[in-house]
C-alpha cells in the first residue's frame, strides 16, 4: 500500500494539538439546525425545533381554535448526492410535522407534509438543482450593548450607547452638549428623541424619589438645630419633604438644599432628611429631573407615545401596548442568547443559564446601561468604550443560523394564512384537521429562495481541493444584515489585533472585497454564541502544561500570551527570563513569570491555504496574499506530483477537502477495482464497508474529478488511512503543480515583464496537461404545435455530418468533435403561418414532409474540441402509448424488484434480531421498559431478557419505548434507530425504482419528454499565453516554448525546464521563492521530501549545509551554457527546483474571433464579449490614434460599414461578392439613436434644406 512520503523537517517537536476538522464549521452548524438522528423528546430548543416552538401554538382570533406543534420527522434522501448532480435535482429529505388541533369538536392529531429541506453532504456542501453550492458563514455585528464616543463640533466628547437586539428595535442613548441624555428608538427615526428621564418613568419608575433611589445611595440625616445646616447645605434631597398634617411640600426630590429651605423645614418640625449621596446639581440625572416635563408614569407614557407617533391620539392603553410591543414582547423583540450574554457581561449582571434565557429587555438593563454611561462620562477608570471592529463585538452566523432565520420568516407567513383559514372555515359542512389549514408553500418557497438567490449561498469554487476547502471556511461581512461593499470603510477591512489565531490576516481577495471576505485561521473554532475561539496552552506556576484552553477575543484581553516559538527546557519551563508576548493586543517583551498562556503552534495565525506556502516568513504580505489566492486557481493536472518542499499541511488539507477516500474503520482490503474498494471490518469481517470511487466527473469549474485506488487486496488499513487518490492529490497529499528545474536569468528578452519561458520537454512529458469536461444539454419538449423529436433524420443535412450520430440521433461515445459538429439531432414542429402562399401551394402538390419541421440540433460551440466521453439520457414513459409487450415486460421487472425488496427486508430483520440478541439475551434489565402510548410495562426492572421479550421489542418502534437512561438503553437506541433508518431507506429505494420502471424519469421538468446530456472531454496542453505561478505570488504568462536543445544547460548536460526573470524578485520582496529553489535542489538531489512549516522552517544555514552535503555549489548558483551557441554565460545563475502551478486562466478559453455575429437591437453595433460572439470595440482613443495618422478611408470604414451602418453593411457584402473595391457609407444607426434621444428631450433636430 502507498504511504504518504515521509517528509524531513528540522522542527524539534510536533505541535501539541492537531488541527480540528477543517469543514467542521459547516457540518456542525447544520447538524445542530436539523438535529437528525435525535428523538423528538431529546431535541434541544435550537435550530428548526426552536423556530417551530416560537411560532406555535397558533390561536384563532377568538381563541376557540388552537393549533399546537408536537414534533417533526425527516425522511431519507431519494437519491445519492452523485445521482442528484447527474439528474440536475436537489439533494433533500421530506419534512413531516405532527400537529395537534383543538377546537369545539375535540382534539385531532395529524402528521402534515411540509415540503422538502435540502440536506448537507458529508463534505459540507448542498446540491441544489444539480449544482454543488456552499453557504458561506457571515460575520456581523454582535447583538448586545456598545458604548461609543464622538467629538462634537464645539470640541466636547459626547458618550453614547446602543443596545442592539438580534431582532427588533435598536435603543440608543447619547449625551447632548448640555449633559442631558436623550433616547433614540430605531436609527431610521433619529429625529424622534425622547429625554431619558421620560423613558425611565415610562418603564415604571413613577416618582422622582424612586428614580433617585435607583441611581444614588440614599442616607438619612437628622435635623435637630441650625448646627446641622453646615453639613446639609448644597446636598440634594432624595425624597419629597412633606408636612404630615397640612401636606405642604417644603422640598422636592432632586432639589438642592439652601439655608432658607432648611430653616423652613426645621420650623415645620421635620427631624430627618433623606439625602442622595454623591449627587449635585451638575449630575446628569439631577439635570434631567429638572428638565423632565412629566412627573408620573401615565404622563411619561403618553409623552413617549406622542413623540413616537405624532398625530395619533395618545391614550394610556395605546401607549402601554406600544412600549410593550417595542421591547417586552418576545415575538417582536429578541436579544438572543448572544445579546443577553454580551449585555450582562458588560453591565456586570450574572451569566447563568436562567438569566441568559431572558431574551427581552428588562428595566434593570436600561437603568444599568444609563449608570454605566454616566460613570463613563464621569471618567471612571473601570469603564471603557467598545471597539466595534474587535472580534469580541463581531460574531459569525453559520449555515444553520442563516437557514433558521429564513425558516422563521417562512413560518411567520404561514401563521397568517393559518389564522385566516381558521376564521373562514365552515364548521357546519366539514371537520377541521391540521392538514386543511396548513400551507407548506411559505416554508418551501423561502428555502428555495435562500439556496438559489441569497448572496451567501454560492456556487462552489471547485477548481481544486484547496479551493473547495477554502470556500467552506470563508467568512463574509457582506450579505443581508451585513455590510455593503460601497459603504464599508477602511477600519472594517483592516487587520485587527484580535484576529490573531481567529481570522487569517493574509488570505482575502484583491479588489473591492478586500478585507470584507476573509478566511478562518487553521485552529479556529466557532463557539455556541458564534464568537471565534482559538486554542492556547495554559501556563501554571511557570510550567507550560499540555492543557488546552479555547479563548474568545474578549477573554484573551486579560491574558499574557507567549509565542509558540518561545524556547522551553526539559521541564516545560521557559528557558529565558523574558520572552515575546502579547497583552491587550500589543506585543512586548514580557517577564516569563507573568505569562499565563502560550500559542499552540506558529501556524495558528494563518489559514490553511496560507499555511501551504513554504518560507512564508520570507515573503512580503502582499505577495503572500496573491500566493494564497492563486493556489486556489491551480488546475488539477493529468499526472500529479507532490511538492518536494512542502509545509506538512498537504496531507491534512487533502483529507478534509473530501478529495481523497479515507478508511472509516480498521480492516482488511477485500476487493479493489477502479470503481470501488471493499474493506472487511477488523472486529467483524462479515460486515463490509464499500467505498465507491468517482470516475471522470465534471466539477463546477469544468475540471475533471477522478479517484484512483492506492491500496491492493490484502492490505491492512487503519482508521484514517488513504485508500484512493483524487484530483490534484498524490499519494494522499495535495499536489497542485509540478517540481520544475528553473533558472533565474534573462533569455533573449523573452521573460520581459514576468513572462515565463518553458522547455518543450515539459510539453512532451505532458507535465502540465489537464483534462477539462464540458457538459452540453438538450431537452425535447411537448410544444403547442406537437412534440419535439430527438432523431437522426434532420432536414437538409448531409450524411457526412451525421456520421458520428447513432440511430437514435445521439453522438456515439468516443467520437472526436470540433466546433459546429452535431452532438444530438433534434427537430421541432414549425408553425404553418411562417409559410408564404406559393410555398404552401407547392407543399400541397408535392407533400414535402421536411418543410413542416425545423432543425434544432445541439452543436458544439466555437472554441471547444474534444472527445465525447459520456452520454446520459433521461426520458418520461407515457402510460397510454405503451404496447402490450412493454406492459408485460414492465410487470416482470416489477415482480423481480418486489422479490429483491422482500429478500433484502428479510435480511435486514435477521441482522436486526442478531444484534438485539447479542445485546440483550440472558441479560438483566437495568431499568423497566415502558410503552410510551399505552403505558404498559413491557419489561420489568431486573427481569432477564429471553427470546420472546426480544421479539416483542423487535416489533416496537423506538419512539414508543421509554427507559431510564443507562448504557444498555443507549446501545438499544442506536440499534433500533439504525434499523428504522435502513428500512426507511430500503423502502424509498424500492418505491423510486418501481416509479422509474412505470414512469421513467418522473423528476424531469414539466413538459420535458426527453433530456440528453453529452459530456465532451478535452485535453489542454500548456501553451503560449497560459498563466502560471509559484506559491509566493510569483505569477507570469508563458511567452515562449523553446526546443529542449536551445534551453540553457548545466555543466553535467542537464537542461533547465523553465526560465524566470530575476527582476521579479527584488521589488516584489518574495524571497521565499529563492529559498524554495535552493532547498528544492538540495532535497531533489538527496532524493527526499522536506517540510518547512510556516514560521518554523529551514534556516538559511541549514540549506547551505544540505547543498554542500549533496555536492552542490554552496551559494546556490551554477554556471549555465547557452543551448544555441554552446558557450558559457558570464555570470553564475540561481538554479534549482521550484513548485510551479498552472492556473485556470487558460488562453484557449480567452482567445476569440468574430467575422459575422449578432448586433445590438438599439444601436445596431456588434455586441461585446466572447459569450455573445461579440466584436472588439474600436473606442474613442483608438479613433484618435487613426486620426493622428490621417487614415480617413480606414476610419470611415471602421465607424460605418464595419459597425452600425445597416444599409452600408449590405452594400459592402454585395461589392465583396462582385469583386468591386467600393465603399459608399451611409448614416450610422447610433447617429439616429442620438437624434431620437434629443427629440425625446424636446429638441427638434432634423435635416433641413437651406437655399444657398
UniProtKB/Swiss-Prot annotation:
Transferase in keyword set: yes
One GO cellular component, as annotated: DNA-directed RNA polymerase complex
Family annotation (Gene3D superfamilies): 2.40.50.100, 2.40.50.150, 3.90.1100.10, DNA-directed RNA polymerase, beta subunit, external 1 domain, DNA-directed RNA polymerase, subunit 2, domain 6, RNA polymerase alpha subunit dimerisation domain, RNA polymerase Rpb2, domain 2
Similarity section: Belongs to the RNA polymerase beta chain family.
Role description: DNA-dependent RNA polymerase catalyzes the transcription of DNA into RNA using the four ribonucleoside triphosphates as substrates.
The gene coding this protein: rpoB
InterPro entries in UniProt: DNA-dir_RNA_pol_bsu_ext_1_sf, DNA-dir_RNA_pol_bsu_external_1, DNA-dir_RNA_pol_su2, DNA-dir_RNAP_su2_dom, DNA-dir_RNAP_su2_hyb_sf, RNA_pol_bsu_bac, RNA_pol_bsu_CS, RNA_pol_bsu_protrusion
EC number: 2.7.7.6
Domain of life: Bacteria
Disulfide-linked positions: none
Self-association state and partner proteins as the record states: The RNAP catalytic core consists of 2 alpha, 1 beta, 1 beta' and 1 omega subunit. When a sigma factor is associated with the core the holoenzyme is formed, which can initiate transcription.
BP-aspect Gene Ontology terms: DNA-templated transcription
Organism: Chlamydia muridarum (strain MoPn / Nigg)
Catalytic activity annotation: RNA(n) + a ribonucleoside 5'-triphosphate = RNA(n+1) + diphosphate
UniProt entry keywords in alphabetical sequence: DNA-directed RNA polymerase, Nucleotidyltransferase, Transcription, Transferase
The name this protein goes by in its record: DNA-directed RNA polymerase subunit beta
Cited Pfam families: RNA_pol_Rpb2_1, RNA_pol_Rpb2_2, RNA_pol_Rpb2_3, RNA_pol_Rpb2_45, RNA_pol_Rpb2_6, RNA_pol_Rpb2_7
Top-level EC class as recorded in UniProt: transferase
GO molecular function term, any single one: ribonucleoside binding
Amino acid at each position: 500500500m502507498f504511504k504518504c512520503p515521509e517528509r524531513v523537517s528540522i522542527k524539534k517537536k510536533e505541535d501539541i494539538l492537531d488541527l480540528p476538522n477543517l469543514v467542521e464549521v459547516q457540518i456542525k452548524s447544520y447538524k445542530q439546525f436539523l438535529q437528525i438522528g435525535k428523538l423528538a423528546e431529546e431535541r434541544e430548543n435550537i435550530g428548526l425545533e426552536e423556530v417551530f416552538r416560537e411560532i406555535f401554538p397558533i390561536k384563532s382570533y377568538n381563541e376557540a381554535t388552537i393549533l399546537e406543534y408536537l414534533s417533526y420527522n425527516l425522511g431519507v434522501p431519494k437519491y445519492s448526492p452523485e445521482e442528484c448532480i447527474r439528474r440536475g435535482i436537489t439533494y433533500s429529505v421530506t419534512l413531516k410535522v405532527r400537529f395537534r388541533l383543538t377546537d369545539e369538536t375535540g382534539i385531532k392529531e395529524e402528521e402534515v407534509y411540509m415540503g422538502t429541506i435540502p440536506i448537507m453532504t458529508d463534505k459540507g456542501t448542498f446540491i441544489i438543482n444539480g449544482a454543488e453550492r456552499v453557504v458561506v458563514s457571515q460575520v456581523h455585528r454582535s447583538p448586545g450593548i456598545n458604548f461609543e464616543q464622538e467629538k462634537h463640533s464645539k470640541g466636547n466628547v459626547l458618550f453614547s450607547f446602543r443596545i442592539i437586539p438580534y431582532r427588533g428595535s435598536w435603543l440608543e442613548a447619547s449625551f447632548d452638549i448640555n449633559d442631558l441624555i436623550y433616547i433614540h428608538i430605531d436609527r431610521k427615526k433619529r429625529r424622534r428623541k425622547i429625554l431619558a428621564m421620560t423613558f425611565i418613568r415610562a418603564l415604571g419608575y413613577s416618582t422622582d424619589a424612586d428614580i433617585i433611589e435607583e441611581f444614588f445611595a440614599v442616607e438619612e440625616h437628622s435635623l435637630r438645630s441650625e448646627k446641622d445646616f453646615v453639613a446639609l447645605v448644597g446636598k440634594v434631597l432624595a425624597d419629597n419633604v412633606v408636612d404630615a398634617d397640612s401636606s405642604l411640600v417644603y422640598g422636592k426630590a432632586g432639589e438642592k438644599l439652601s439655608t432658607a429651605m432648611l430653616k423652613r423645614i426645621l420650623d415645620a418640625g421635620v427631624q430627618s432628611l433623606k439625602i442622595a449621596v454623591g449627587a449635585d446639581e451638575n449630575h446628569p440625572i439631577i439635570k434631567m429631573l429638572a428638565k423632565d416635563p412629566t412627573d408620573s408614569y401615565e404622563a411619561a407614557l403618553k409623552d413617549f407615545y406622542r413623540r413616537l407617533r405624532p398625530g395619533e391620539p395618545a391614550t394610556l392603553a395605546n401607549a402601554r401596548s406600544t412600549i410593550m410591543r417595542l421591547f417586552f414582547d418576545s415575538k417582536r423583540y429578541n436579544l438572543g442568547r448572544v445579546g443577553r450574554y454580551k449585555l450582562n457581561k458588560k453591565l456586570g449582571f450574572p451569566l447563568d443559564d436562567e438569566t441568559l434565557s431572558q431574551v427581552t429587555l428588562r428595566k434593570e438593563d436600561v437603568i444599568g446601561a444609563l449608570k454605566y454611561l454616566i460613570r463613563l462620562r464621569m471618567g471612571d477608570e473601570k469603564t471603557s468604550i467598545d471597539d466595534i471592529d474587535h472580534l469580541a463585538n463581531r460574531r459569525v452566523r453559520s449555515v444553520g443560523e442563516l437557514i433558521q432565520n429564513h425558516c422563521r420568516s417562512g413560518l411567520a407567513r404561514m401563521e397568517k394564512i393559518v389564522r385566516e383559514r381558521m376564521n373562514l372555515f365552515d364548521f357546519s359542512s366539514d371537520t377541521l384537521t391540521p392538514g386543511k389549514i396548513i400551507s407548506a408553500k411559505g416554508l418551501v418557497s423561502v428555502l428555495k429562495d435562500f439556496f438559489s438567490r441569497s448572496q451567501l449561498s454560492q456556487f462552489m469554487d471547485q477548481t481544486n481541493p484547496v479551493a473547495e476547502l477554502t470556500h467552506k471556511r470563508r467568512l463574509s461581512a457582506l450579505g443581508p444584515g451585513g455590510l455593503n461593499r460601497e459603504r464599508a470603510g477602511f477600519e472594517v477591512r483592516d487587520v485587527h489585533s484580535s484576529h490573531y489565531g481567529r481570522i487569517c490576516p493574509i488570505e482575502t481577495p484583491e479588489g473591492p472585497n478586500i478585507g470584507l471576505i476573509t478566511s478562518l485561521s487553521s485552529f479556529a473554532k466557532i463557539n455556541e454564541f458564534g464568537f471565534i475561539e482559538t486554542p492556547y496552552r495554559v501556563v501554571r506556576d511557570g510550567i507550560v502544561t499540555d492543557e488546552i484552553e479555547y479563548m474568545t477575543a474578549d477573554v484573551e484581553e486579560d491574558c499574557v500570551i507567549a509565542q509558540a516559538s518561545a524556547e522551553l527546557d526539559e521541564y516545560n519551563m521557559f528557558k529565558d527570563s523574558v520572552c515575546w508576548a502579547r497583552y491587550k493586543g500589543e506585543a512586548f517583551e514580557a517577564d516569563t513569570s507573568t505569562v499565563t498562556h502560550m500559542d499552540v503552534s506558529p501556524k495558528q495565525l494563518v489559514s490553511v491555504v496560507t499555511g501551504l506556502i513554504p518560507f512564508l516568513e520570507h515573503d512580503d504580505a502582499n505577495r503572500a496574499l496573491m500566493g494564497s489566492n492563486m493556489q486556489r486557481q491551480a488546475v488539477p493536472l493529468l499526472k500529479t506530483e507532490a511538492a518536494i518542499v512542502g509545509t506538512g499541511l498537504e496531507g491534512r488539507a487533502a483529507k478534509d477537502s473530501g478529495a481523497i477516500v479515507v478508511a472509516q474503520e480498521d480492516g482488511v482490503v477485500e476487493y479493489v477495482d477502479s470503481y470501488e474498494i471493499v474493506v472487511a471490518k477488523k472486529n467483524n469481517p462479515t460486515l463490509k464497508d464499500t467505498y465507491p470511487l468517482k470516475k471522470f466527473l465534471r466539477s463546477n469549474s469544468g475540471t475533471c474529478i477522478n479517484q484512483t485506488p492506492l491500496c491492493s487486496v490484502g492490505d491492512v488499513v487503519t482508521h484514517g488511512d488513504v485508500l484512493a487518490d483524487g484530483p490534484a492529490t498524490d499519494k494522499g497529499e495535495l499536489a497542485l503543480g509540478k517540481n520544475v528545474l528553473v533558472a533565474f536569468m534573462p533569455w533573449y528578452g523573452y521573460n520581459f515583464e514576468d513572462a515565463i519561458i518553458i522547455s518543450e520537454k515539459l510539453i512532451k512529458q505532458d507535465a502540465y496537461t489537464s483534462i477539462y469536461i464540458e457538459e452540453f444539454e438538450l431537452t425535447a419538449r411537448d410544444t403547442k404545435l406537437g412534440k419535439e423529436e430527438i432523431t437522426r433524420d434532420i432536414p437538409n443535412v448531409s450524411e457526412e455530418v451525421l456520421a458520428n450520430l447513432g440511430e437514435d440521433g445521439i453522438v456515439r461515445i468516443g467520437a472526436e468533435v470540433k466546433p459546429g459538429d452535431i452532438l444530438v439531432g433534434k427537430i421541432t414542429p414549425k408553425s404553418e403561418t411562417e409559410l408564404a402562399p406559393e410555398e404552401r401551394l407547392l407543399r400541397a402538390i408535392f407533400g414535402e414532409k421536411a418543410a413542416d419541421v425545423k432543425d434544432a440540433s445541439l452543436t458544439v460551440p466555437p472554441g471547444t474540441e474534444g472527445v465525447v466521453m459520456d452520454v446520459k439520457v433521461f426520458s418520461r414513459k407515457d402510460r397510454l402509448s405503451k404496447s402490450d409487450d412493454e406492459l408485460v415486460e414492465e410487470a416482470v421487472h416489477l415482480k423481480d424488484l418486489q422479490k429483491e425488496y422482500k429478500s433484502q427486508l428479510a435480511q435486514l430483520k435477521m441482522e436486526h434480531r442478531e444484534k438485539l440478541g447479542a445485546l440483550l439475551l440472558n441479560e438483566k434489565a437495568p431499568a423497566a421498559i415502558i410503552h410510551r402510548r399505552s403505558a404498559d410495562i413491557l419489561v420489568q426492572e431486573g427481569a432477564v431478557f429471553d427470546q420472546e421479550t426480544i421479539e416483542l421489542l423487535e416489533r416496537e418502534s423506538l419512539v414508543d419505548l421509554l427507559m431510564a437512561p443507562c448504557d444498555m438503553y443507549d446501545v438499544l437506541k442506536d440499534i433500533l434507530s439504525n434499523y428504522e433508518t435502513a428500512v426507511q431507506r430500503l423502502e424509498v429505494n424500492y418505491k423510486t425504482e418501481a416509479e422509474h420502471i412505470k414512469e421513467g424519469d418522473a423528476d424531469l421538468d414539466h413538459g420535458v419528454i426527453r433530456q440528453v446530456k453529452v459530456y465532451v472531454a478535452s485535453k489542454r496542453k500548456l501553451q503560449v499565453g497560459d498563466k502560471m505561478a509559484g506559491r509566493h505570488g510569483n505569477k507570469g504568462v508563458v511567452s515562449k516554448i523553446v526546443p529542449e536543445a536551445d534551453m540553457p544547460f548545466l555543466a553535467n548536460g542537464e537542461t533547465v525546464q523553465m526560465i524566470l526573470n530575476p527582476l521579479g524578485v527584488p521589488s516584489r520582496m518574495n524571497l521565499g521563492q529563492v529559498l524554495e529553489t535552493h532547498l528544492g535542489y538540495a532535497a531533489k538531489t538527496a532524493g527526499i521530501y522536506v517540510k518547512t512549516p510556516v514560521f518554523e522552517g529551514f534556516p538559511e544555514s541549514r540549506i547551505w549545509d544540505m547543498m554542500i552535503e549533496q555536492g552542490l555549489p554552496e551559494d546556490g548558483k551554477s554556471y549555465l551554457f547557452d543551448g544555441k551557441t554552446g558557450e558559457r554565460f558570464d555570470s553564475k545563475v540561481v538554479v534549482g527546483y521550484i513548485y510551479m502551478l498552472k492556473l485556470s486562466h487558460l488562453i484557449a478559453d480567452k482567445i476569440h474571433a468574430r467575422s459575422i455575429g449578432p448586433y445590438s437591437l438599439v444601436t445596431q453595433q456588434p455586441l461585446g464579449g466572447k459569450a455573445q460572439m461579440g466584436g472588439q470595440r474600436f473606442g474613442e482613443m483608438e479613433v484618435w490614434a487613426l486620426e493622428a495618422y490621417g487614415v480617413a478611408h480606414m476610419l470611415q470604414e471602421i465607424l460605418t460599414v464595419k459597425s452600425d451602418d445597416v444599409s452600408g453593411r449590405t452594400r459592402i457584402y454585395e461589392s465583396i461578392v462582385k469583386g468591386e473595391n467600393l465603399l459608399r457609407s451611409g448614416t450610422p444607426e447610433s447617429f439616429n439613436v442620438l437624434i431620437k434621444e434629443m427629440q425625446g428631450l424636446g429638441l427638434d433636430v432634423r435635416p433641413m434644406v437651406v437655399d444657398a
